[in-house]
């Protein structure tokens, strides 16, 4: 189940961010100001927790990359969304939760936000994440440096709607 993250989740998210594996996968520049992020109610970013029977296990962030105020992604077309995802609980990594969260977020971007393109930027060294993103359909855009982090930008384009054959 997915639910919106709230200010009450701040301490949990800070603890997840301190995990050495999460830090290694996230890079030096990829940390959220949870006090600000969870207190603001803006329509260009969403924070969702994956919640299992025994509590939250991971978080996924959905960003309208064209409207996001820091312009992290540079100048992108309207309808471009970006994702950031991590599994906070070590016992949940490598068990399919990230795939399920990613598929949920892709569906939300395309159906709720009418996105035409989704971007994601794992570190070039995060081979497992890159393989996952490719497996669900993302394609390489190319390497890019964000701050001190060497990333591989990948994108997923919205599938074209089916076309009806002309009658006659």
What positions do the PLM features span?
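Conserved acetyl-CoA-binding loop of GNAT-fold acetyltransferases
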Residues: 134-143
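Hydrophobic pocket-lining residues that define ligand/cofactor binding sites across diverse proteins
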Residues: 109-113
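Acetyl-CoA-dependent GNAT
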Residues: 28, 33-92, 108, 158-159
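Hydrophobic adenine-recognition pocket in adenosine-nucleotide-binding enzymes
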Residues: 5, 87-88, 122
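Short, high-confidence coil segments that cap the C-terminus of an alpha-helix
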Residues: 45, 114-115
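C-terminal "cap" of GNAT-fold acetyltransferases
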Residues: 77-80, 116-119, 123-127, 143-168
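Conserved acetyl-CoA-binding loop-helix of GNAT-fold acetyltransferases
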Residues: 94-108, 131-135
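A short, well-structured alpha-helix characteristic of acyl/acetyltransferase catalytic modules
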Residues: 1-39, 160-168
């Amino acid at each position: 189940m997915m639910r919106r993250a709230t200010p009450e989740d701040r301490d949990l998210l800070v603890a997840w961010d301190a995990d050495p594996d999460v830090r290694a996968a996230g890079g030096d520049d990829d940390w959220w100001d949870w006090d600000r992020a969870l207190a603001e109610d803006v329509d260009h970013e969403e924070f969702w927790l994956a919640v299992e029977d025994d509590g939250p296990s991971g978080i996924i962030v959905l960003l309208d990359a064209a409207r996001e105020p820091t312009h992290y992604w540079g100048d992108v077309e309207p309808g471009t969304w970006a994702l950031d995802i991590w599994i906070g609980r070590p016992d949940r990594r490598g068990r399919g939760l990230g795939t399920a969260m990613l598929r949920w977020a892709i569906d939300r971007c395309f159906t709720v936000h009418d996105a035409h393109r989704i971007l994601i930027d794992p570190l070039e060294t995060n081979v497992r994440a890159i393989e996952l993103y490719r497996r669900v359909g993302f394609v390489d855009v190319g390497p890019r440096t964000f701050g001190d982090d060497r990333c591989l930008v990948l994108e997923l384009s919205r599938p074209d709607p089916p076309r009806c054959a002309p009658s006659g």
